[in-house]
């Protein structure tokens, strides 16, 4: 499994102060641009992409509807994504499928989409249908993050991931059950067929994230012969 570390600067000064030495061995950087006001995103972008030019980068606008910090119309959401893609060619672009499904057809020319679904309230009863709908679209990555209310919710997320990966071996999945209760799903990513796990530098970008330092240690143990 690859380790993804989110960075969440709230202004250009914080972007410039990001310490590369702390994340040098990280596989992928996720830029959570929703920590900025809309008009600052393109201003901060050059600092981010220059600083992380040696890493794979995910561009993410996590909206309030899915646990983030920004509210955007369909038009603004698409415009920002297209501007960033044209100027900086991020390796991956997160697209909130269920929040912006009506405009997905305008993204069909993007081959690097992460079609994502985030539910910070529950693990929905129709989780299998969520997996099916996203898988049928065959994006670069299917990402699903849900909140468990009990142990069975965690096991359901893990079992569905394993099952869909077995049936669709060429599709990349990134899944997690959030909070402390769901933390095992982050550690068992390889086992269940999830390609990435997310780790935090300091501030969590989602409940239950493990620190990068701890995740490196755990990964060493899991990868040891």
UniProtKB/Swiss-Prot annotation:
A GO molecular-function descriptor: 3-dehydroquinate dehydratase activity
Xref: InterPro entries: Aldolase_TIM (IPR013785), DHquinase_I (IPR001381), Type-I_3-dehydroquinase (IPR050146)
EC number from the UniProt entry: 4.2.1.10
Pfam families the UniProt entry points to: DHquinase_I
Top EC category: lyase
SUPFAM superfamilies (alphabetical): Aldolase
Protein name as it appears in the record: 3-dehydroquinate dehydratase
Organism encoding this protein: Streptococcus mutans serotype c (strain ATCC 700610 / UA159)
Annotated gene: aroD
């Amino acid at each position: 499994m690859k380790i993804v570390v989110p960075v969440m600067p709230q202004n250009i000064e914080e972007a410039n102060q990001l310490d590369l030495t702390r994340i040098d061995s990280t596989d992928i950087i996720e830029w959570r641009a929703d920590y900025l006001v809309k008009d600052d995103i393109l201003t901060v972008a050059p600092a981010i992409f220059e600083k992380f030019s040696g890493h794979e980068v995910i561009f993410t606008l996590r909206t309030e509807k899915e646990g983030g910090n920004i509210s955007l119309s369909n038009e603004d959401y698409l415009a920002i994504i297209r501007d960033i893609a044209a100027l900086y060619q991020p390796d991956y672009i997160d697209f909130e499928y269920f929040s912006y499904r009506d405009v997905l057809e305008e993204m069909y020319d993007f081959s690097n989409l992460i079609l994502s679904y985030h539910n910070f309230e529950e693990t929905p009863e129709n989780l299998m249908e969520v997996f099916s709908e996203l898988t049928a679209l065959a994006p670069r990555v299917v990402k699903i993050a849900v909140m468990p209310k009990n142990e069975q919710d965690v096991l359901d997320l893990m079992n569905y991931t394993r099952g869909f990966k077995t049936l669709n071996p060429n599709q990349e999945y990134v899944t997690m059950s959030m909070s402390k209760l769901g933390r095992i799903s982050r550690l068992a990513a390889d086992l269940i067929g999830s390609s990435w796990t997310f780790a935090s530098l300091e501030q969590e970008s989602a409940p239950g994230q493990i620190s990068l330092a701890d995740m490196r240690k755990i990964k060493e143990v899991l990868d040891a012969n």
